[in-house]
Amino acid sequence: MTLQITTEKAEEVMKAYVSKYHHGISCVDAIGGYSHKKMYLLHTVISSYELNDIVQLIQEVDENVIINVFKTEDFYGGFYRESLD
């Protein structure tokens, strides 16, 4: 599954997510089409069994987050990452 996460708290979301799940995550600067506020789009690929726990974690960090879930047909490359510590 692929998550597209729209948040104003990218650093906090990424830190919480990476420290617990050790998956890669990408961050892109964005501007809200309605609010015109600066925000961020985060993209990551997860296993379906992780979905509920990850959504809960992200919502704890940012109560205003928007999370769009896509079914991923195929995924190639490293899935689990070694800790950066």
What function would you assign to each model-found segment?
Residues 1-85:
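Positively charged, small/polar-rich N-terminal and surface patches that mediate targeting and assembly
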